[in-house]
Amino acid sequence: AALSAPTAQGLLYEVDMRLRPSGRQGPVAIALSRFARYQAEEAWTWEHLALTRARVVAGAPPVCAALAQVITDVLSRPRGPEALTDVRSMRRRLAEAKGEGGPWELKDGAGRILDIELLLQTGRMLTPGVQAVSPTQLIAGLAGAGWLARDQADHLRSHLGQLMTVQQITRLALAGPYDPQKGGPGLAQFLAEAAGCTDIEALGARLAADSTKAAAIIETVLGDDA
């Protein structure tokens, strides 16, 4: 597809066309009315979670406004307890598939980036008055709406920012995951200083402890199936 065309700097956009509603057999683009009907009648919970990140970026103004309204309407509809049940099930499946990893696994695992983002997307879906898209704005909005306690929001904001800072630095410096045994002393010092830690060991310990606390917050907010 043209969206995934290779360029000198890599793929234009990494788009998996298999994720469109009709799979490999369906059209790449569909009518707005069909999109609205699919979201209202057929979409699964995980698709509505993904919709919390949607933004209209280009198009004729009337079409953009209509699409934005469809997204708002879908995310504003009442949700029953089955929505949280679906989210908890998704979280369990992700944990089983990805495992926990070590302190330098920034993206996957309990209390890491994807886990926190799943919580925030759930909050956005269950709190129609919160219209934010970015994680930082979502945390503030969900705390303001009372969906997150202030201390929970403060920890999630701080920890997510820390994880993303380390992730951005290591992605610029390395071709793969960070390993303190192989990354070199210069990168280790830079990472520690960027996070306000004395050394790389202290940063690793902080990431592990803060991830454990974030996971506990997520479990408290999402509840259980009992």
Model feature map: region roles:
Residues 1-226:
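A nucleotide- and high-energy phosphate-metabolite-utilizing enzyme signature
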